[in-house]
A protein has these predicted regions:
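N-terminal beta1-alpha1 ligand-phosphate binding loop
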Residues: 1-22, 26
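Conserved strand-to-helix beginnings and helix N-cap segments that scaffold or border functional pockets
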Residues: 16-19, 59-60, 91, 111
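Rossmann-fold NAD(P)-binding glycine/threonine-rich loop
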Residues: 81
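Short, glycine/polar-rich helix-capping loops at beta-to-alpha or helix-loop-helix junctions
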Residues: 86-89
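Structured adenosyl-cofactor binding patch, chiefly the S-adenosyl-L-methionine
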Residues: 91-132
Length: 132
């Protein structure tokens, strides 16, 4: 199971719609759960922080990384911080950190971008034509 744990609520309708679209698409490939919390607490399982200082992957590399983690771990949680990022005490409990880009994105938009990248990775793993 893949859990996406994000700080704070999504406010913008267009962000919610984008997230709903990719969450629906992802159900064909994996059990993906999206959770919003005001305060982050680190659950059990393998925890990956989305952090601008984390390791960067291109889409094919991320698909390989995700496939490997899905084979090794029963539960994978990706943590997305709020406007202030992920608190240091939470980062210290994460096994790994990955970055979507060296650029900084609004935390609300990161949710859609990351869901799209998860979907893209799943289609790459299945050899489908979404990623060209």
């Amino acid at each position: 199971m893949i859990t996406i744990l994000a700080t704070g609520k999504v406010r913008e309708r267009y962000i919610k719609e984008g997230m709903e679209e990719y969450l629906t698409r992802l159900q064909k490939y994996a059990k993906v759960v999206y959770v919003e919390k005001e305060r982050l607490n680190v659950p059990d399982g393998f925890i990956i922080a989305l952090d601008e200082k984390g390791k960067q992957y291109n889409s094919e590399q991320f698909a390989s990384y995700l496939k490997k983690k899905m084979l090794e771990e029963k539960n994978i949680t990706f943590i997305i911080g709020g406007a202030e990022g992920i608190p240091n005490e939470v980062k210290l409990k994460c096994q790994e950190k990955i970055a979507l880009s060296a650029m900084t994105f609004p935390n609300q938009l990161v949710r859609v971008i990351f869901l799209e990248q998860l979907y893209r990775a799943c289609t790459i793993m299945k050899g489908e034509n979404y990623h060209k």
